[in-house]
A protein has these predicted regions:
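Structural motif
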Residues: 1-3, 100, 129-130, 183
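Conserved N-terminal subdomain of the carbohydrate kinase-like
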Residues: 23, 48-130
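Glycine-rich phosphate/adenosyl-contacting loop at the front of the ribokinase-like
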Residues: 1-55
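Short, acidic Gly/Pro/Ser/Thr-rich loop/turn segments
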Residues: 10-12, 97-100, 138, 191
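Cofactor-binding loop segments of dinucleotide-utilizing enzymes, especially the Rossmann-like FAD-
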Residues: 5-9, 59-61, 82, 136, ...
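Conserved beta-alpha-beta core of the PfkB/ribokinase-like small-molecule kinase fold
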Residues: 130-194
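Residues at the starts of beta-strands that form the adenosine-phosphate
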Residues: 1, 53-55, 76, 158-159, ...
Length: 194
């Protein structure tokens, strides 16, 4: 089983403009698509498409639209209840092939919501499983959360991968070599942060 943790999930909205994006201008949208997002959810969707057993874990308020989208796609998931809504990330596609991204920070999680997320993750995995910790951390989650989770999961015999950046990546590096994940997926920019 592969379990993904998306600590800061999103609704990814992509709008395509009929022309060039001009700051301060009025623009017409030629298409508007919203889908589930967050690195861990994207990983889980890819794993499911490959026909492998996967479970996506993420925080979301009861009735959040993200849950409905994942239900509609048939992706196995467990969400931990939160008081805030899932963030929306906006991508604006305009001529001549330019993409502008605007990302919300996400709703802050309380210490009890962070603890519930950890509990769901650790109870979902068994020795020999793979856990993928992916993406940014929601506000309220300590920067060293992934580093802590690596140790907790590896102590249970779980293989752990991490795909993150900025402060969580630096905290992971600071915990190495004892708290090093089994695999790490940095891009060129993230490698430069180390």
């Amino acid at each position: 089983m592969i379990t993904t943790l998306t600590a800061n999930p999103s609704l990814d909205r992509t709008v395509t403009l009929a022309g060039e994006l001009v700051p301060g201008g009025v623009h017409r949208i030629s298409s508007d698509v919203t889908g589930p997002g967050g690195k861990g959810i994207n990983v889980a969707l890819g794993i499911a498409r490959a026909g492998l057993d996967v479970l996506a874990i993420f925080p979301a308020a009861p009735g959040d639209p993200l849950v409905g989208l994942l239900d509609g796609l048939g992706l196995p998931h467990r969400e931990t209840p939160t008081s805030g809504r899932v963030r929306t990330n906006l991508a604006v596609l305009s001529e001549p092939g330019v993409t502008t991204k605007i990302n919300e920070p996400g709703s802050a999680l309380s210490p009890s919501e962070v603890s519930a997320l950890e509990d769901v993750l650790t109870s979902a995995v068994s020795a020999g499983d793979i856990a993928m910790l992916s993406g940014s951390l929601a506000p309220g989650i300590p920067a060293d959360e992934y580093a802590r989770l690596v140790g907790l999961l590896q102590a249970r015999g779980v293989w752990v991968g991490v795909d993150t950046s900025d402060e969580p990546l630096l905290a992971l590096a600071a915990a190495a070599p004892q708290g090093a994940p089994d695999f790490l997926k940095p891009n060129a920019e993230e490698l430069g942060q180390l």
